[in-house]
Amino acid sequence: MSDDITSEAQTIAVGQLRAFIERIERLEEEKKTIGDDIKEVYAELKGSGFDSKVVRTIIRLRKKEDHERQEEEAMLQLYMDALGMS
């Protein structure tokens, strides 16, 4: 009886593991599809005359809180001033 319980538990664990792996694989495929879609949008953006590098910077900055962005901009300005770049 103990062996039956162990075998059943092992079967359940294997099933759970397989389900997790399959979910991750599906999500990875979705992530790839989304990445491809984003590349297409950047290509359209570039084709319309926009600078994709600048747009990427804007997107990165928009993800930050205002105070984080202001702090980063202040540090950038400080470093540029120190190097005589402003």
UniProtKB/Swiss-Prot annotation:
Pfam families: GapR_DNA-bd. Signal peptide: none annotated. InterPro entries: GapR-like (IPR018753), GapR-like_DNA-bd (IPR046367). It comes from the Bacteria. GO terms for molecular function: DNA binding. HAMAP family: UPF0335. Belongs to the UPF0335 family. This is UPF0335 protein BAB1_1765. It comes from Brucella abortus (strain 2308).
